């Protein structure tokens, strides 16, 4: 490998600004902020959305398309739901 061409990959702490959740990960992103985390000092990266606050990971996701293909077919042709009748 060539020297001095690779980015500086190091452990950094990511802070979810929405929830205050912190987690340690590796990154090449540079920052001037630092934070104390688990007894060590690490660079701090602030993020607006992480797995702690994103609706997909928290289970608070709203689905915009609630009807499936079968439901649309039944509505189009005026058929009743076979499962609801039982």
Curated annotation (Swiss-Prot):
Q: What are the recorded Gene Ontology BP terms?
A: translation
Which cysteine residues pair off into disulfide bonds? Answer: none
- Tell me the InterPro entries matching this sequence: Ribosomal_bL28/bL31-like_sf (IPR034704), Ribosomal_bL31 (IPR002150), Ribosomal_bL31_B (IPR027493), Ribosomal_bL31_sf (IPR042105)
Question: Pfam families annotated for this entry?
Answer: Ribosomal_L31 (PF01197)
Record-level Gene Ontology MF annotations = structural constituent of ribosome
Query: What cellular-component terms does GO give this entry?
Result: ribonucleoprotein complex; ribosome
What are the entry keywords? Answer: Ribonucleoprotein, Ribosomal protein
Q: Which NCBIfam families match?
A: L31, PRK01678.1
The family annotation for this protein states: Belongs to the bacterial ribosomal protein bL31 family. Type B subfamily.
This protein is called Large ribosomal subunit protein bL31B
In which organism is this protein found? Answer: Streptococcus agalactiae serotype V (strain ATCC BAA-611 / 2603 V/R)
């Amino acid at each position: 490998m060539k020297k001095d061409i690779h980015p500086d990959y190091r452990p950094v702490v990511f802070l979810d600004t929405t929830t205050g959740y912190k987690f340690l990960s590796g990154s090449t992103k540079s920052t001037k902020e630092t934070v104390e985390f688990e007894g060590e000092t690490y660079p701090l990266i602030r993020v607006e959305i992480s797995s702690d606050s994103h609706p997909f990971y928290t289970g608070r996701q709203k689905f915009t398309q609630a009807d499936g293909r079968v439901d649309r077919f039944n509505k189009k042709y005026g058929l009743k739901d076979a499962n609801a009748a039982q």
